[in-house]
Amino acid sequence: MPYHMMKPSALELMKRGRKDYADVERYCANPKEFLGLLDHLGVERAGLINYVAPKIIGFTPEANDWIAKYCKAAPDRLIAFGGVLPGTVPDAGAEVDRMARIGIRAVKLHPSHQVLSPNEYMHGNRELAAVYERAQTNGMPVMIHTGTSIFPGARNLHAQPLLCDDVAIDYPELVVILAHGGRPLCMEEAFFLVRRHKNMHMDISGIPPQKLLEYFPRMEEIAGKVLWGTDWPGPGVPEIKGNIEKFLSLPIRDEAKRKILYDNAARLFPR
């Protein structure tokens, strides 16, 4: 992500307790360095999450151009996620179209950092409706942050998973991904939505792998709609390798592990 855009308070939280911060900066500055890390870890492809939240985090719409350029280093391996925040661009729907043209594969909404409820289009926000409409037309999944955020100024009420219920209903051809599975307060809501809606998925990034079955004891039931992720280098996520190893040690079927680690992402983001 473009760390140079981050507000000092947000950047301080990203740095806190992270001994490898210099390495993180190096990976962000040079995609070849990051690809070398993926090779070392045995990771075939990675989704790089970016979004627009100028007031709380500092990310402006220019983050889309930054990540599109970054991922051009290896578009077969680096999956670009960009963002739209109505009011920061003249036409939110047109911005989604532009994102698709420059190689961005998915849209990320962060309700608690954007102070924007996922279903706000039902209350007159036509620009948000345009985001969903154009993403659906362009075949771009929309990832929506669910659950809490500890960043200064985050408005967590907007990130309740059930607010995404309307989105799944009103845009039935849109792939919706609930980021973080509602962690840590709303995981039952996320599980319910993934089971209810054909077009609803979730990722498990930002959740300690050893706690996954405590939070989602019936995770194997939805294994075909769960995406593995780490949320690295976010707060509380020290490394990628340990996350993978702990996930692989879970007492679930190998078939379920493969779906979560590989098959589901390969299906949603074909090369």
Regions found by a protein language model. Give the residues of each.
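Active-site environment of divalent metal-dependent phosphoester hydrolases
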Residues: 2-6, 53-56, 86-90, 113-116, ...
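Mid-to-C-terminal alpha-helical segments outside catalytic/metal-binding sites
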Residues: 2-45, 97, 223-225, 235-271
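Non-membrane alpha-helical structural segments and their capping/turn regions in soluble enzymes
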Residues: 25-28, 61-64, 89, 93, ...
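Generic structural signal for well-ordered alpha-helices
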Residues: 31-38, 64-71, 96-97, 128, ...
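Conserved, mostly hydrophobic/aromatic
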Residues: 38, 67, 71, 99, ...
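Active-site gating/metal-coordination segments in enzymes
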Residues: 44-45, 53-150, 196, 200
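Short beta-strand segments
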Residues: 45-50, 83, 177-179, 203-205, ...
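Catalytic pocket-lining loop regions of alpha/beta-barrel enzymes
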Residues: 105-109, 120-228
